[in-house]
Curated annotation (Swiss-Prot):
Encoding gene (name): OPG079
Family (UniProt): Belongs to the orthopoxvirus OPG079 family.
Annotated organism of origin: Vaccinia virus (strain L-IVP)
Induction: Expressed in the early phase of the viral replicative cycle.
Protein's name according to its UniProt entry: Truncated protein OPG079
Organism lineage: Viruses, Varidnaviria, Bamfordvirae, Nucleocytoviricota, Pokkesviricetes
Miscellaneous remark of the record: This protein is synthesized in the early as well as at the intermediate time of infection.
UniProt keyword list: DNA condensation, DNA-binding, Early protein, Host cytoplasm
Amino acid sequence: DLARNLGLVDIDDEYDEDSDKEKPIFNV
């Protein structure tokens, strides 16, 4: 996960690289 690697956003560990494409990355 690019965003997770950069530490820009907090996402669940369940979200894999493929999952990020399908599910929203930003949790507001």
